[in-house]
């Protein structure tokens, strides 16, 4: 009887593990267009939503998207609230101390500065500027390291808040991913412009997973390798980033 009970318990554990692998819970912010955002219909949309669905189709898993605010997005992963982060998160050494990353699914791409058109800001020798960044990002770390001594770094909970405060004149410049700033400039009616040199920080964007989830990491990497090879990733980049790339294949 004891052996039967133990066997049943073991089967239950295996069944639970199998069921867990049938669903891929993807943590995302839903506030960082065109990577991930809530559309007019109140649904999650964007590059990473489509890519997540492509990964699930390739692996035979079912996608479940879980929204999280940006600041606690890594702690929520570690706590088990979802299985992988897909939220425009750059691969950095600091983050790798806490979590692992898949291979990148968006190549390293420059960050850029944005300001009111004609503001005439000298970002090479800035002084007294109010520089807006989204908190806990690679841009925030760069701004603190390079500009905090002579300028005020203003941290925002979301990218959209930083742009709103720039438009309202509450900050002088915003530093963010160029891929996210492109549509902002395009839709500003000429009120905003990108300027200054490209800022290369981060090692591309990848999916964050818990350190112990090595099998899941391997599964996701296999899927991404296949989706790059068959052109799916490049097609989604072209769709969501105005055909501008960067791409994995020529």
Residue ranges: model-predicted function:
Residues 21-88:
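Extracytoplasmic small-molecule ligand-binding "clamshell" domains
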Residues 107-114, 182, 186-221, 243-250:
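Periplasmic-binding protein-like
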Residues 115-131:
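Flexible hinge/capping segments at coil-to-helix
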Residues 72, 87-98, 144-145, 172-201:
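A ligand-binding cleft/hinge motif common to bilobed small-molecule-binding domains
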Residues 49-50, 65-75, 135, 154-168:
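Short helix-initiation/N-cap motifs at beta->coil->alpha
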Residues 15-20:
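Sec/Tat signal peptide C-region and signal peptidase I cleavage site
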Residues 138-157, 193-195, 224-250:
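Ligand-binding clefts/hinges and TM-proximal coupling segments of bilobed small-molecule sensing domains
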Residues 60-62, 79-87, 129-130, 158, ...:
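Alpha-to-beta junction loops
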């Amino acid at each position: 009887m004891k052996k039967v009970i133990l066997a049943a318990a073991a089967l239950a554990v295996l069944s639970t593990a199998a069921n867990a692998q049938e669903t891929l819970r993807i943590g995302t912010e839903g506030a960082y267009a065109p990577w991930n955002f809530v559309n007019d219909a109140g649904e999650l949309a964007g590059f990473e939503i489509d890519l997540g669905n492509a990964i699930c189709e390739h692996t035979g898993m079912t996608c479940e998207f879980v929204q999280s605010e940006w600041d606690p997005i890594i702690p929520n992963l570690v706590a088990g609230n979802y299985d992988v982060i897909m939220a425009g998160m750059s691969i950095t050494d600091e983050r790798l101390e806490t979590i692992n990353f898949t291979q990148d699914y968006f190549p390293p791409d420059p960050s850029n500065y944005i300001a009111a058109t004609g503001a005439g800001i000298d970002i090479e020798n800035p002084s007294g500027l109010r520089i807006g960044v989204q908190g806990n990002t690679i841009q925030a770390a760069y701004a603190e390291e390079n500009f905090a001594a002579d300028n005020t770094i203003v941290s925002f909970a979301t990218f959209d808040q930083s742009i709103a405060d720039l438009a309202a004149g509450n900050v002088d410049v915003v530093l963010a991913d160029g891929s996210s700033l492109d549509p902002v400039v395009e839709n500003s009616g000429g009120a905003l412009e990108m300027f200054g040199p490209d800022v290369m920080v981060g090692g591309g964007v990848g999916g964050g997973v818990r350190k112990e989830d090595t099998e899941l990491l391997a599964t996701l990497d296999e899927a991404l390798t296949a989706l790059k090879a068959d052109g799916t990733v490049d097609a989604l980049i072209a769709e969501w980033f105005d055909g501008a790339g960067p791409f994995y294949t020529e």
